Amino acid sequence: MKRYIHFKEIDSTNTYLKNHHTSYGDLTFISASYQTLGHGRFNRNWESNENENIMFSILIKNKFLLEKYSSISLLMSTCVYKLLVALKIKDLSIKWPNDVYVNGKKICAILLEGIPQEWLVIGIGLNVNQIIFKDSRAISIRNITNKKYNLSILKRKLYRVIINELKLLKKNKSNYLEIVRNNNYLENKIVNVEINNQQKKVKVLKINDDNSLKVLVNDEEKNIISGEITFHS
């Protein structure tokens, strides 16, 4: 069965794979030139002009990888990080658990959805050629380099990086956690968050070995897993 499928237009690559996961095998790659209902975590809108950015989703069904669910989001962030390093992009950082930043502005968002014990859909949105954004906190590769990129070539490069990193994860040889820790966007920052429906200010301390985030809340250390916390600007 074909692993790489591209749509000119779709509501959302993640939604498509979620609705059709039984029809496709492990590591199926679905991309689109334009998403009419692209979204990030907590259904936040993901702004992307047609044919200017990379938007794709990958289906995971491998049992070992599903057991590594807590590692996947950070691993995907490091895949994007490695691609950007290869493009000589500097001032990179990774915001736990799923965003990549350049000089404090978001260049990539990652979304995980599914039933972790059965299947997982990983959605990646990477700003490439778009120049103007409604959100001043967004940035693209072209904004940084002043170069226009072939999206098909860049997508396939990123796909190869992802496949290679997943193989390393299976062998317990991935260095994703080291990369995330060395480029931790949140480390030592005071941030506004929502925990258990309560607004709080916390200090981010570090990323733990189990991929959880250690924060200081009212002088008390607390470990947070992805999904338990929402960051606010």
How does the language model describe each region?
Residues 99:
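Conserved active-site carboxylates
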Residues 1-87:
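N-terminal lobe of the biotin/lipoate ligase/transferase fold
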Residues 3, 65-92, 102-233:
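Long, positively charged amphipathic alpha-helical accessory segments at protein N-termini or as interdomain linkers
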